[in-house]
Amino acid sequence: MANSSFIGDHVHGAPHAVMPEVEFPDQFFTVLTMDHELVTLRDVVINFSQEEWEYLDSAQRNLYWDVMMENYSNLLSLDLESRNETKHLSVGKDIIQNTGSQWEVMESSKLCGLEGSIFRNDWQSKSKIDLQGPEVGYFSQMKIISENVPSYKTHESLTLPRRTHDSEKPYEYKEYEKVFSCDLEFDEYQKIHTGGKNYECNQCWKTFGIDNSSMLQLNIHTGVKPCKYMEYGNTCSFYKDFNVYQKIHNEKFYKCKEYRRTFERVGKVTPLQRVHDGEKHFECSFCGKSFRVHAQLTRHQKIHTDEKTYKCMECGKDFRFHSQLTEHQRIHTGEKPYKCMHCEKVFRISSQLIEHQRIHTGEKPYACKECGKAFGVCRELARHQRIHTGKKPYECKACGKVFRNSSSLTRHQRIHTGEKPYKCKECEKAFGVGSELTRHERIHSGQKPYECKECGKFFRLTSALIQHQRIHSGEKPYECKVCGKAFRHSSALTEHQRIHTGEKPYECKACGKAFRHSSSFTKHQRIHTDDKPYECKECGNSFSVVGHLTCQPKIYTGEKSFD
């Protein structure tokens, strides 16, 4: 552009997301064109509200500043004697430096109220500007009046046909008695007095010039968001001419009754309305499950196809969903972004934090419909419900045994693999289950944290305490379905049922003899190994069965077991 400006030199670095906070005085940058009529920058300024400004992208905001600068330059160029003149505006006393013509800078006594405009800040007592940033700062009120009124010159970019003879100028402008050489020149000159706004909108009665850049604000009435649709051939919503603008006013728009959101096409209403009416139009071809949104169906179908498109670059593990990969990567990075506000414990996954916080709140939102027992975690309820249904979905591929829980299957499989990942630091004994190690360590520590409230006896294990308490209560919850006999322990019922089935699962590898009970099998094996772990303190003799040791003191005392 030919002229530098109060904004033009400093806006193209990076258009800001926040609209500039500037308000023009009523007579700001007013140019006296023919000693009579004033053309002000306000006549040609394009105003945006905050909401409209946010819809513009960086390219559109740059274009906005270009249009503003061009309009301002056009006003200045109307009365210059030379097109090569240089004008420079700066903040302070020397506001305008000009060569070739005389200019006067004056303070405006009146501020305009441009409601809804992006130029909002009061100009009074504002004179500072940050020339380094993209935002427009505050400028002094000023009015530029031309003392020299040279002959009329058109805009630099406008090329008009010239007539060589003065007699060939039939077009006369009555107000100034100026004669022009052609109708185009005459029309363009008339726009000086009308602000260059020959096109009027029949919806809002706003006027526009032929410059298509002025159409930036035409989306105000329709709610069309700039740079979102490409129906009009050129870039986004910068419409070519006034006819396109009129078309928008006449175009039918479709509104979602529930959400009060407006759409340009009826096809765009349907997906949003499905959210309100609960319709599920997208059905999975594998399992028949339906979804309201197609993206949800696509995500779901990865379960059936076993498609895993997201790979961890650290360990190569694949995942179906990006969120799963993100959570997994925190294992490698050690990141735990979710912190408990009660105990400051941290977690990798937000769902873990939510479940943990229920320990502090006591919330148990998942209740069993069969027995009413409540749980703080959904998966605990799922495991519990299998007690009522008898469902055991996890099967051991080695022996065919089935389990209700995946963790039980994992522990069982270690019997076949011999894996014992949990090792005691005191005696280096290894265990296949972590809870077994915890119980074992209490042998070394002597800890017995579980106390019977009836007799005060302590136990290392909760299961031992529960079994003991049944002695006081007489409870025998495990009943044989064949003969009706009841037992305090589930293991006792299991061994009893083998009497009816004839099952003897414990077989001696040395002689092939089979046993119903593991204790009987252990005693028998000591015959082959000659193991005698029970020693008499009186005589030093050892025995393979503890019962023989119990009878030994009677030999020394002469006590008779039977009368």
Swiss-Prot record:
What keywords sit in the KW lines? DNA-binding, Isopeptide bond, Metal-binding, Nucleus, Repeat, Transcription, Transcription regulation, Ubl conjugation, Zinc, Zinc-finger
Q: SMART domains this protein is in?
A: KRAB (SM00349), ZnF_C2H2 (SM00355)
Positions bearing the Glycyl lysine isopeptide (Lys-Gly) (interchain with G-Cter in SUMO2) cross-link: 87, 268
The Gene Ontology terms for molecular function here are: DNA-binding transcription factor activity, RNA polymerase II-specific; RNA polymerase II transcription regulatory region sequence-specific DNA binding; zinc ion binding
Where does this chain mainly localize? nucleus
| CDD domains per UniProt | KRAB_A-box (cd07765)
Q: Cite the residue ranges of zinc fingers (C2H2-type).
A: 199-221, 254-276, 282-304, 310-332, 338-360, 366-388, 394-416, 422-444, 450-472, 478-500, 506-528, 534-556
UniProt-listed InterPro entries: KRAB (IPR001909), KRAB_dom_sf (IPR036051), Znf_C2H2_sf (IPR036236), Znf_C2H2_type (IPR013087)
Q: Which GO terms describe its biological process?
A: regulation of transcription by RNA polymerase II
What does the entry list under GO cellular component? nucleus
Q: Where found, per UniProt?
A: Nucleus
Q: Which family does it belong to?
A: Belongs to the krueppel C2H2-type zinc-finger protein family.
Role according to the record: May be involved in transcriptional regulation.
* Name the UniProt record assigns to this protein: Zinc finger protein 529
- Which species expresses this protein natively? Homo sapiens
Name of encoding gene: ZNF529
